[in-house]
Each structure stands twice: as structure tokens, then as C-alpha cells.
Amino acid sequence: MSTPLMVLGTSSGAGKSLMSAALCRLLLRQGETPIPFKGQNMSNNAWVDESGGEMAYSQALQAWAAGLKPQCAMNPVLLKPQGDSTSEVIHLGQSVGTARAETYYEQWFRPGWSVIREALKDLQCSYTHGRLVLEGAGSPVEVNLQRRDLTNLRLAQFLRARCLLVADIERGGVFAQIMGTLSLLKPVEKQLIRGLLINRFRGRRELFDEGRDWLEAETGIPVIGVMPWLEELFPPEDSLDLLERRGKKNDAEIEIAVLKLPSLSNFSDLDPLEAEPTVQLRWVEPGTFLGMPDAVIIPGSKQTLRDLNSLNRSGLGSQLQTYAQSGGHVFGICGGMQMLGRTLADPLGLEGVTTTDPSSSMAGLNLLPLDTVFKRNKALSQCQRITQWPDNAKVKGFELHHGNSQLIQGSHESVLPMADDPSMGWVSKNESCGQVAGTYLHGIFENGRWRRLWLNLIRKQKGLADLPTDISNHEQQREQLLNRLADVFEEHVNINPLLGT
């Protein structure tokens, strides 16, 4: 294999994930086989690969940028936060337990390092002529964590990777970020840094020339690029950044409110709607006013019962019920659909609130006649279906859930199955409760025809003309965005120092 490359950052949110994706696409253009890899990631924005293994969405995106199918070996350790300083631990795509922050490295460091090396071996055997493109996590110089590092310098030294250090100038203090990071590196670690990259620069590049010269003189490391500010092309890995995303669209014709749940997961499900020029997404947090949007989406949740509690305590749940009863459109995805049901029971405490007695199940929003029980085994699979609502359409996506939802006995006359597989989701026929529907299929909005059919239901209610439904799926738009990202990266970044040329 070619010498591995690694993208490190001075902090979380510096832009490592997108710069890694850009690097993968650029190497692919140059005839290489880049292989994305992040030893350990912490995220509730997940993807399910063809084998039924969970991995972080950011590594799936990097795989697409590299022209490869995502596989969980590209992210062998995934930590999915579930509140109270506890995370679900995923090794090579499968759940292996939960861990508390204070004991994680004591209990899970050795098993984690073992599966990371196993995944690396598998990838190296599968792509003998490839080049690993590694992504670090957070900052590589968190002094209190370095002894148990699984993702940054331990991996860089193990593979003798050539490293790129990315700093976000938008946050301010970029010189302190870089100089502070380099000063905390040991000499043997600093030798691995082959280039510096300034990310999210606004304005004319020549205004940074003096700063670039100073950094190179002080560090002895070339500044190989200054990436301009790009309106965020893809969802941030951290859900805390969601409210800082795009502003108001000038051409938006419909507004869709999306509930920003405390344990929000799989928010990349909404990315195809973000890409619709006539759609404005408005993220609504518990405790804020819902208003009368044209539709409401309840996305997935890592802690469904806990998030349902939050909706009820804040009054947002009752606002949503009133909205639906007034004829509004409500759509739930996975945990969001479960919340729309009558009851939710979690006897094992998997979703935030333990309900050991079925009779003590938590009440849902009661907008769909569903009862849900959360079970130990998790449904993990990619799937294809033919929808029956809003109309016939081929759709594909993936399932990722503990909950098993069943229609209440005698309620079949009040709902329609969404697809040829009735368990994929349901839509209410009760017009007094609005157009309420839900699905277990993550990625449903990636399907272009289905997305437009759903949007046209909303547009019809507003008296707007239908949008064309004969369109491509979002994966083609994603390809265009990846190419745009790589175009800008190629224009502004010289990767030769990384390649040793």
C-alpha cells in the first residue's frame, strides 16, 4: 500500500471530515484508491452498510467520495452517546455493550485497539494497492487522554502516516490553535505533520499571505492551503451545530419544522430536503413555539422515551397534537414515528426510561394507532420497497432500530401501510388528525420521486403547483456536491508535500 495520509484538527469541528472527503475524491481523480478510515468516532449520525453493520455517516460519505461502498471496517469503533455520560459501544458494526465516560478507557481501550488493528488488516488485504486516508478525532493533544488515544497520534505513529493539521479560522485564534497544538506534540510526533491547512477563510486570500509566511517561518511546516468559506454542503457531525447551519432561502415556498430532539440521531435523513431550493427547514427545540409550518418532521432519536418526555414537559408535544388535529402534515422517522404512536414500552431501559411493566408503558402522542416495545436485538439492514403512499415509487434506505411497532387491534381501517412491506410505516386515514405518517426507513427522502410526491401533498394544500417527480435520487446530488468540494480543494490546496512529491 501507499503511505497513509492523516487529517488531524486543532479542535472538534475544524473540518476534518469534509477535508478527508475532499482528499479522497482528489486522490480518486488522480488514479489512486483512497480508503477512508477513522478508528474511533463518536456520533449518533449513523449509516448501515450492506452487511448490516453500523458505522458513522461521515465515513460513509468519505467512502462515496473515494468511489467505494461504505463498510463498517472503515469505522471499527463507533460510540453512540445516549445521555448521562453513557454511550453505546459499536465494534465492527455490532453493538457490544455500553460504557460510562469515566471507565471507558479502563474497560474498552484494549478491545478497541484490537478491533482497530483487525479492521486495518482487513482493509489492507482488500485494497493492496490503495492508500489509507485517516481522520483524527477532536484535538490530537488532549493531554489527559493521550495515554489512551485510539484515533489520533497512536494511529499515525503505528502506520507512519503523513499528517495534515487543519485549523478553523472562522472560530478565531487560528495562530494560537496551530502553535498551541504543535507545542504540545512530542518531537517524534511533530515530525509526522507535513502540512498545515487553514479552513473556512472569508475574503481575499492574499490578506492571509503575511500570516501564512509567519506560520511557515515559526513552525518550519508548509501551509499547503487556505480553504475558502463554503456554505455547509453536508450535515455537521455534531448535532449541536445544526442550528448554525444555513439561513433563510430566498426562493423557499414551503416551511417544514423539524424537531431538534435532545438525543437527535440520523439527522442526515433531512439533507435531501435541505437541498430542495423551494423548502425551508426550521429547527424547533423543546420549549420554543411550533407555530403553523406547512409540515412537521420528527426525526430519529437515540433516546426515544427520554426525548418524548422532553416534548411533553416543554409543551411542544401538545402543540404538535393541536397542529395535527387542525389538519397539519406530520411525518415521523424511526423514533419519531414511535413517538407518534399510542404507547411505548422499554422494559430493558434501552431508550432512556425503563418501563418494566407493560401496563406502565409511556403514552405516545396518540396520532398513529401503534404500540411499540423496545427489544434487545436491533434491526440493522439495507432494504428496498415499493411505496403505496403518497403513490407508487421504488425506495431504498436502511433500518436501524430496537423498537418493534404493531398496529393496535382493530385499527387497520384507520391507517394505510406506506409500502408493500406493511412494517415499513403507516399513514393515518383520519382526516380530523391531519396527514400523519411515519416510517422505519432511514434515507426515505434520498429517493427523489418519493420525496417530491410527499412535497406535492404539502404544496397542494397551499395551492402551489406540483414539482416534477421524474428526478434523480439524492445520491446524484451528493456526487455533484463532492465534486464541487474537490474542485475547490484542488484549486486551493497543494497536496504534494503530503504525497512526498
Swiss-Prot record:
- Does the record's keyword annotation contain Protein biosynthesis? no
Alphabetized CDD domains for the sequence: GATase1_CobQ
One Gene Ontology term of the biological-process aspect is:
cobalamin biosynthetic process
Lineage, top-rank taxon, reads Bacteria
The Gene Ontology terms for molecular function here are: ABC-type vitamin B12 transporter activity; catalytic activity
- Alphabetized PANTHER family for the sequence: COBYRIC ACID SYNTHASE, DETHIOBIOTIN SYNTHETASE
Q: What is this protein called?
A: Cobyric acid synthase
